[in-house]
């Protein structure tokens, strides 16, 4: 029986499920599912519809089942800087804001009041981009501290 491995790539404008298997010592890739994606405005903020994305992930898994190609493992790749805050019952806290939203403008200076840019870079090695997670978290700290 063939073994299948599923990679789910969720990008800014679409998501896809790529199924991999080995045949004669070579990797075979097959796109089994694709869906549109994008942020929508919610409460004045560009947000991801995380619940719909979860549904799309499950839809792609159903396609694998229909094809009789059940993956033995699965990996999901998304946008490196976005996140979802959860409460103690695993419920989403607040809006699932996306990196393309402008709410982080000016948050770099707020962060540097706590840790200078040089020290931040020394700790993380990450290039400064105003949409980085640390600036997004500063927005939450400044505007919705009860979520932290």
Question: Over which residues does each language-model region extend?
Answer:
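N-terminal glycine/serine-rich phosphate-binding loop of ATP-dependent small-molecule kinases
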Residues: 1-95, 122
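Glycine-rich phosphate-binding/catalytic subdomain of phosphoryl-transfer
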Residues: 62-148
